[in-house]
Regions:
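P-loop NTPase Walker
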Residues: 1-109, 113, 208, 262, ...
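Conserved helicase NTPase motor core
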Residues: 4-15, 19-23, 34, 53, ...
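Conserved phosphate/pyrophosphate-binding and hydrolysis machinery centered on Walker-type P-loop NTPases
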Residues: 7, 55, 87, 112-116, ...
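Residue-level signature of catalytic and energy-coupling elements of molecular machines
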Residues: 10, 28, 58, 89, ...
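Short glycine-/polar-rich loops that comprise or flank the Walker A/P-loop
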Residues: 19, 47-51, 81-83, 239-242, ...
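Conserved nucleotide-binding/hydrolysis micro-motifs of P-loop NTPases
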Residues: 29, 59-62, 91-94, 249-253, ...
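Helicase P-loop NTPase motor core
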Residues: 29-35, 272-275, 280-357
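Coupling/switch/interface segments within P-loop NTPase motor domains and analogous charged loops
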Residues: 116-181, 185
Length: 357
């Protein structure tokens, strides 16, 4: 029953349970379905669901995967074991570990978590304590620099030695900001990851507990992991190396916030014994869209080669309009929408996609 409805590539990914596994999943190729069915298959072999860990990036993705996994386990489980897999975001996993073990640097297990508003306010306070005006020194811009450098495992001292004056300032603010967090027994989102990897790499008890508790590790959207998340995944895999990562180098869009595409491109260097499965069948788009996507993305030389295909219909041709400026683009889109509505198309059947930045 677990393999019903899966294509051959998905079945291979589901049935490959031991050792490192790289699932290269093209857009719309059913990656979540594959991971969920893989979890169910592992449980069907006699492994407790509580020994399975899956980590993704957003609360929405974690919630969807958890709900689908629980539903499938209810249908397929042939044991009295009613435990569930641990499915969370990287940050939620960090909170869990730090509250259980405390940070390696000795900070308490009870701490508050700063949201974006809190961190901005604290950086404003740091600037003011240094005699600087937050109005002329953008706290959000400074926080962005600090966050990117922290996730690259740099230090305030390294920033302060930079030739760029903005980076030198960010290094000084970072030190004051850190003192402010410590005085409040607070951690920001970056700390949840940084202190987690510190814990996993330096605390033998915590690392051994994770290895004993979670025998099978799944990491979603691996192409978007940064250096810290990469090391968390490696530490969790341990000597057993039952690490399944899912991702697609063609969908890497977060390098600006520290994501390192090398993590997925060099997975086979990290784990030479890894099995690689390509999920190339798209269940979402028409043949026209898939063909265009393949032609565009194949120009990228830094990728895992694959060729998406679909068994859906051909679909309408793609049209391209080159506007003179943003206003001309907007005018063109509005006119096309009006034409379609006048011809009987419902407004709710029209979608307009645009970049937020």
């Amino acid at each position: 029953m677990i393999l019903i409805g899966l294509n051959d590539a998905q079945k291979k990914a589901v049935l490959t349970t031991e050792g490192p596994l790289l699932i290269v999943a093209g857009a719309g190729a059913g990656k979540t379905k594959t991971v969920v069915h893989r979890i169910a298959h592992i449980v069907s072999t006699g492994v407790s669901a509580s020994q399975i860990l899956a980590v993704t990036f957003t609360n929405k993705a974690a919630k969807e995967m958890r709900e689908r996994a629980i539903a499938l386990l209810k249908e397929t489980a042939n044991t009295s074991d009613r435990s569930i897999p641990f499915i969370s975001t990287f940050h939620s996993l960090g909170v869990f570990l730090l509250r259980r073990f405390g940070a390696y640097n000795g900070s308490v297990k009870r701490f508050t978590i700063l949201d974006d508003g809190d961190t901005t306010a604290l950086i404003k306070e740091a600037l003011q304590s240094m005699g600087l005006d937050p109005k002329t020194n953008d706290p959000r811009a400074l926080k962005s620099i600090i966050s990117k450098c922290a996730n690259a495992l740099q230090t305030p001292e390294q920033l302060m030695s930079e030739s760029n004056p903005t980076y030198r300032l960010a290094g000084r603010v970072w030190l004051a900001y850190t003192k402010g967090k410590e005085s409040q027994h607070a951690l920001d989102f970056d700390d949840l990851l940084l202190q987690s990897i510190d814990l996993l790499e330096k605390n033998d008890e915590a690392r051994a507990w994770c290895h004993d508790t979670w025998r099978y590790i799944h990491i979603d959207e691996y192409q978007d992991t940064n250096e810290v998340q990469y090391r968390i995944a490696k530490a969790l895999a341990g000597k057993r190396k039952n690490l399944c990562v899912v991702g697609d180098s063609d969908q890497s869009i977060y390098s600006w916030r520290g994501a390192n595409i090398k993590n997925i491109l060099e997975f086979e260097q990290d784990y030479p014994e890894a099995v690689v499965v390509l999920l190339e069948e798209n269940y979402r788009s028409t043949k026209t869209v898939i063909s265009a996507a393949n032609e565009v993305i194949k120009q990228n030389i830094h990728r895992t080669p694959k060729n998406l295909f679909t068994n859906k219909h051909e679909g309408d041709p793609i049209s391209l309009y080159g506007g003179y400026d943003e206003a001309d683009e907007a005018r063109f889109i509005v006119e096309r929408c009006v034409e379609r509505i006048d011809s009987g198309v419902r407004p709710e059947d029209i979608a307009v996609l645009f970049r937020a930045n």
